[in-house]
Amino acid sequence: MATRLFTSESVTEGHPDKIADQISDSILDAMIKDDPKSRVAVETLITTGQVHVAGEVTTKTYVDIASVVRERILEIGYDSSKKGFDGASCGVSVSIGAQSPDIAQGVDTAHETRVEGSADDEFDRQGAGDQGLMFGFACDETPELMPLPIALAHRLARRLSAVRKEGQIGYLRPDGKTQVTIEYVDGKPARLDTVVVSSQHAADIDLDTLLAPDIAEYVVEPELALLEIATEGRRLLVNPTGRFEIGGPMGDAGLTGRKIIVDTYGGYARHGGGAFSGKDPSKVDRSAAYAMRWVAKNVVAAGLASRCEVQVAYAIGKAQPVGLFVETFGTGTVPDIQIQDAVTSVFDLRPAAIIRDLDLLRPVYAQTAAYGHFGRPELDFTWESTARAEALQRAVKG
């Protein structure tokens, strides 16, 4: 019997890096709402009393970026200097230029059209916005087909934020983190080993007599009651530093794209390195990573494997992927190459086809920017659909 421990973490919407992600995606949404063909690459830096927005944008619409920034920060809960940041009074600087024409030409007119003369198929006309490799993953550990450690970490982080906003624990502040360690036996989750919850709080809050009991009662225990694995003997660590009064952008500077493992699978699967937030779907860092989750989830939903990881790779300016790789870690019901061939026949992985099939030219991105882009049953994300599972089953049978 092989016993191992695996750990994943999540952060709340008030974590400085997540504030930056949400600002970048809120700006993206505002542009796509009025001009779905907007090309957007927006980065955000947030620090004590200041927000800096920079990047490259080509759009037909106008967005009051400073207003978008302030509204998002206030929605998160930073509305007073007593909390370390005030969205109403912070400084906002904006430095936005146009998308490079050298990049635009490869996206607007793909290699297949410019060089290979393939102009008949409209999906051959749009090239990938960059080179790169993207991974998607799914497994049968949870109903949403996500690894249990990251799924539980996200649930705890969402509940930590909810009890603050609903006033159940009114002295909490927006910044917070969760971490979950699961004991695996023979590759299957068997027992909850450790939960760590760190939350920013008001001054003069006693950790032992108030904060720790409240976190246990209102945040941790309701989620553990839903678990289908053993929880006896677990450890709960609340604010292990002893105090967390200074948080958010006052405690640490935040940057777009610094929580890519939280955004995906909690380290349980590989990552191509590209961040998501602030990028329109012509950037395959985002759209192809969503597509790979879609593919992997359908493979598992089809019963072809209990774990599936899919890699795709692109060359900038080229529509067709330059590589596809399927790995089921020995859990496949048929050979991996057979699943790979089925994926190729069922899914069109050219960027324009992904954008069409997943309906990505919509303002849906700000809601992805906290608590994970995948395995969100409370949200109706197109890349979480398993409607192609039956088509994969048929394709495998030939």
From Swiss-Prot:
Mg(2+) binds at residue 17. Binds 2 divalent ions per subunit. It comes from the Bacteria. L-methionine binds at residues 56, 99, 252, 283. Its cofactor is Mg(2+); K(+). K(+) binds at residue 43. Gene3D superfamilies: 3.30.300.10. It catalyses: L-methionine + ATP + H2O = S-adenosyl-L-methionine + phosphate + diphosphate. Pathway: Amino-acid biosynthesis; S-adenosyl-L-methionine biosynthesis; S-adenosyl-L-methionine from L-methionine: step 1/1. It is an enzyme of class 2 (transferase). ATP binds at residues 15, 175-177, 243-244, 252, 258-259, 275, 279. Homotetramer; dimer of dimers. This is S-adenosylmethionine synthase 2. It comes from Frankia casuarinae (strain DSM 45818 / CECT 9043 / HFP020203 / CcI3).
